[in-house]
Design a protein with these regions (language model features):
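A structural motif corresponding to the C-terminal end of an alpha-helix
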Residues: 15-28, 99-109, 232
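Conserved, mostly hydrophobic/aromatic
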Residues: 30, 103, 111, 214, ...
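N-terminal pre-catalytic segment of deacetylase/amide-hydrolase enzymes
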Residues: 134-211, 218-223, 231
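Short, well-structured secondary-structure segments
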Residues: 210-211, 226-246
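Aromatic- and acid-rich polysaccharide-binding/catalytic face
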Residues: 1-6
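Glycan-binding loop/region signatures in secreted carbohydrate-active enzymes
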Residues: 27-101, 128-135
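C-terminal/domain-terminus segments
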Residues: 99-138
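Generic structural signal for well-ordered alpha-helices
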Residues: 9-20, 100, 124-128, 226
């Protein structure tokens, strides 16, 4: 498919209107798309992303997020190291707040999240609350202006040697709220939240194996292993840890 919103608000509303002509809204549970998608000019690289992975990509590429006031989805573009152009679309807590406001006014039977673990954690500030017009004044949206750094780990590249690039830091967001409709009409990521970001190094070429020998060196077996490696011209390196490195 072509790059585009994960869950456009108007598309959602149209689909709910359509199904509600056949099924009572009281029996409809609306699925919330809490993830993103990274489209590349190289289609083999197209992949789904979590909220935090999308934010990390935007931060790494110094991209500016665009919050579309028509779809309520976010997007940005960047180029990878091979000069492929990527277009990323994803949802966050503001997107899902607006969708849940719609669901509560319809009213639908409820909502479900797709998928747990990929969501913007700020949604838990309001997910289990009544977001109907009669109750919305009681909902404090101030917590949505701060995004806590995540303890999950985002890995970059491949290999067994790890380099920590970033640790969790909180982000700051400015919101614009329509007081009449009680929805979020715009948001600006002033600073991006970060998670643990780890660069992997040492990826082996195709059809190449890396053998590891644990619990050494051993005075009997290590020389035998080295003799076999030498005979077959296999390069080797020692990583000494624990007591053996002292």
């Amino acid at each position: 498919s072509d790059p585009g919103p994960i869950a456009s608000q108007k598309w959602i509303e149209a689909q709910v209107d359509k199904i509600s002509k056949k099924v009572s809204p009281s029996k409809v549970i609306l699925g919330l798309g809490a993830y993103g998608y990274d489209w590349s000019s190289n289609p083999d690289q197209n992949t789904s992303v979590t909220y935090m992975q999308a934010i990390t990509k935007a931060n790494q590429s110094k991209a500016k997020l665009d919050f579309d006031d028509n779809t309520f989805n976010l997007s940005f573009s960047y180029k990878d190291l091979k000069n492929n152009v990527h277009n990323v679309f994803f949802t966050d807590a503001a997107t899902l707040f607006n969708t849940m406001r719609f669901a509560s006014e319809y009213p639908l039977a409820g909502t479900a999240l797709w998928r747990l673990g990929s969501e913007d954690a700020r949604i838990w500030n309001y997910y289990n609350k009544d977001l109907s017009a009669a109750n919305i004044a009681k909902i404090n949206l101030k917590p949505l202006e701060n995004v806590k750094g995540q303890t999950m780990v985002d890995y970059i590249g491949d290999g067994e040697v790890l380099d920590v690039l970033n640790t969790p830091k909180s982000g700051k967001i400015a919101l614009e709220i329509d007081k009449n409709e009680n929805i979020i009409t715009d948001e600006n990521y002033i600073t991006y939240p970060t998670s643990y970001e780890v660069q992997k190094h040492g990826e082996a070429p195709a059809k190449e194996l890396v053998l590891t020998f644990d619990d050494g060196p051993d005075e009997t077996y290590t020389p035998q292993v080295l003799d076999v490696l030498s005979k077959h011209h296999v390069p080797a390196v020692f990583f000494l840890i624990g007591l053996n490195s002292e």
